[in-house]
Amino acid sequence: MSTGNVDQELIRRYLVVVKKLYEEPIPQTARQRRRRKQQLRTRRAQLRELEGRILKQILDRGPDQLCQGVANLALAEKSESSN
């Protein structure tokens, strides 16, 4: 598995967890509120763990790849703003 695929998989998992944070209905009873509160704590912990793994992968790359990635982002933003 290439590092690009790992990055995409981590980002996909991150987005799935973020989506779950906001998809659930608002709890009505005290029991539902307690359960929701626990689920939020769990999901936030999952997000922190995934953020750490994503950041570690980014930082593990060589400085050349990071500079090239930043340059690509700048070009993409410039072309997007011109459209």
Swiss-Prot record:
Residues 17-24 are annotated as: Homomultimerization. It comes from the Viruses. One of its GO terms (biological process) is mRNA transport. Keywords: Host cytoplasm, Host nucleus, mRNA transport, RNA-binding, Transport. A motif (Nuclear export signal) lies at residues 65-76. One of its GO terms (cellular component) is host cell nucleolus. A motif (Nuclear localization signal and RNA-binding (RRE)) lies at residues 29-45. It is found in: Host nucleus, Host nucleolus; Host cytoplasm. GO terms for molecular function: RNA binding. The RNA-binding motif binds to the RRE, a stem-and-loop structure present in incompletely spliced viral pre-mRNAs. This region also contains the NLS which mediates nuclear localization. These overlapping functions prevent Rev bound to RRE from undesirable return to the nucleus. When Rev binds the RRE, the NLS becomes masked while the NES remains accessible. Homomultimer; when bound to the RRE. Multimeric assembly is essential for activity. Escorts unspliced or incompletely spliced viral pre-mRNAs (late transcripts) out of the nucleus of infected cells. These pre-mRNAs carry a recognition sequence called Rev responsive element (RRE) located in the env gene, that is not present in fully spliced viral mRNAs (early transcripts). This function is essential since most viral proteins are translated from unspliced or partially spliced pre-mRNAs which cannot exit the nucleus by the pathway used by fully processed cellular mRNAs. This is Protein Rev. The gene is rev.
